[in-house]
Amino acid sequence: MGSRLSQPFESYITAPPGTAAAPAKPAPPATPGAPTSPAEHRLLKTCWSCRVLSGLGLMGAGGYVYWVARKPMKMGYPPSPWTITQMVIGLSENQGIATWGIVVMADPKGKAYRVV
């Protein structure tokens, strides 16, 4: 599926016939529950500018979603169920995009919750 440009270029390069590569040694299976890459998790925890940038981006996206849903209501149109859903997704306490941005900035690793 997709165009040829969306596929990686390496998949179209073939080795000349007669030169076979040695089979690669498969990686050991990951243990369940173990993080796949420690560097991935460490970056968001230690890089304050990364947290601020991603948090503000999410807060801006949530505000935009709310604003787009609110704009027809300001013009006098009655709200539809989809409009209310957009407003909830934009700024809701539990599942909103803007709230997600606040959590990324304030508590990126979930240290505020006790793990039992």
UniProtKB/Swiss-Prot annotation:
Positions with biased composition (Low complexity): 14-24
Listed transmembrane segments: 52-69, 82-104
Chain segments carrying region Disordered: 1-39
GTP-binding found in the keyword field: no
Single Gene Ontology BP annotation: mitochondrial respiratory chain complex I assembly
Domain of life, per lineage: Eukaryota
Entries under Pfam families matching the protein: DUF4536 (PF15055)
Compartments where found: Mitochondrion inner membrane
Main location: mitochondrion
Membrane association type: Multi-pass membrane protein
Keyword line: Membrane, Mitochondrion, Mitochondrion inner membrane, Transmembrane, Transmembrane helix
InterPro entries: DMAC1-like_dom, DMAC_Protein
CC annotations in GO: mitochondrial inner membrane; mitochondrion
Function statement: Required for the assembly of the mitochondrial NADH:ubiquinone oxidoreductase complex (complex I). Involved in the assembly of the distal region of complex I.
Quaternary structure (record): Interacts with incompletely assembled mitochondrial NADH:ubiquinone oxidoreductase complex (complex I).
Protein's UniProt name: Distal membrane-arm assembly complex protein 1
Gene: DMAC1
